[in-house]
Amino acid sequence: MKNLILGAALISSAALSAAPSQKLIVKLKPGYSAKSVSLFSNKSVQDVRDLKVSFGAFYSVKTSGMNQKSLQALSNDPAIEYVEESQVFTVTPIVNKEAIQDARFEDQWGLKNTGNNVGGWWSRGKAGEDINAEGVWKMTRGRKEVKIAVIDTGVDYTHKDLAANMWVNELEANGVEGVDDDGNGYVDDIHGYDFANDDGDPADGHGHGTHCAGNIGALHNRSGVRGVMNNVKMVGIKFLSDSGRGETEHAIKSIDYAVKVGVNLMSNSWGGGKFSQALLDSIQAANDAGIVFVAAAGNSRADNDAKPTYPANYEVDNVIVVGAHDGKGERSGFSNYGKKTVHVFAPGSNILSTVPGDRYQSMSGTSMACPLAAGAIGLLMSESPNLTPKEIRDRVIATAVDNGELGQYTPVGRMDAERLVKNERN
């Protein structure tokens, strides 16, 4: 994949290279429409689709055999603000393939680390190196008014540990099947939307998204596992296919949808590709709407300060980046880090959570740390719903625990949900 290429108003388009077949993301300047771009009718353009997002005029353009001269002309068109090649995003968890049918809270060291329950590759952990869930639960277990988007591979919204905490679009649930009853442009979006397949059913055929949802909001029902929040409304937004892959256009439409349905926070356990102005624009639009964007730091053992990864490295006030630590309170070997760019660490090694079909499974990755941190932030929002995204990020950093290990990889250390909420009460 190529670097982002912007139009003449920003940077040169010289690096936009012709390819036998490629997909472009085009943003038009205000006041222009697709009819204003003559090259959209070029014989090399196979398809032009309006992405219909609320933060600008964006189009997905599929080309075949477009030559360098035509690409240059497209970038220099006075109607176009910028052109970039579509990026590919993926999920990359490390999966324990043995599904656990009869899970227990005692196995969730990320919520309560006894030192003996970390499992996996670590025979022993260190007691207390967790997110301090039991401490915060004495103060709050969340509120149904807090709405969190799980932007991922979808969610098994029928899972017995998740169903009661899934958002329900009542107008669609009580409406006519096949009709856009609420007039939001999305048909039958009862629990969210599937942008990978363009339909109203965000069911998860992969497992990653359901695992993330369980970390945020699995019910405290004396069965299965627990999430950080017992009271929450989760919106299932699927832009990653059942193979775990997605594209820029679906990512930005997912973020825009989350803004439209009024979420408070987005959990994003995905990454890949290079810098995308379109994706940055969508995250900025979420920030403008007062929505927190929690992002996984990445699983390539890299220093994000020196080698950016996206979407984690977008410099917007609402972006909170989460690295992963293990049961000993040390950086998970796979986790990215960054003193300036990774804001906090959370449990991410051998994390037990929900997967489709009323089952449970352990996975590892910053993908797991991200929703655990998102759940803790959701508890803070339950206490203080009027904080700005930047105020929330500042509090996450200020209340983190310096355990003597993680401070070399992040501003302070690991997330502590009790300190985060108690600090607000004080």
Regions found by a protein language model. Give the residues of each.
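Protease zymogen maturation seam
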Residues: D77-K147, V155-N165, H250, T410-A417, ...
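C-terminal subdomain of the subtilisin-like protease fold in secreted/lumenal serine endopeptidases
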Residues: R226, V259-W270, Q277-S282, A289-I291, ...
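Loop/turn elements at helix/coil->beta-strand transitions in domains of secreted/extracellular proteins
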Residues: A79-E81, K144-K147, N230-V235, K260-M266, ...
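Active-site glycine-centered loops adjacent to acidic/histidine catalytic or metal-binding residues
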Residues: D152, G298, G365
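Subtilisin-like serine protease catalytic core
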Residues: E134-E247, F275, N287, V316-N318, ...
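Gram-negative bacterial Sec-dependent N-terminal signal peptides
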Residues: M1-S17
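Extracellular S/T/G-rich loop segment that most often corresponds to the catalytic His/Ser-adjacent loop
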Residues: I291, T309-S382, N386, K390-D394, ...
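Inhibitory N-terminal propeptides of secreted protease zymogens
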Residues: S17-D107, G135, V263-L265, P389
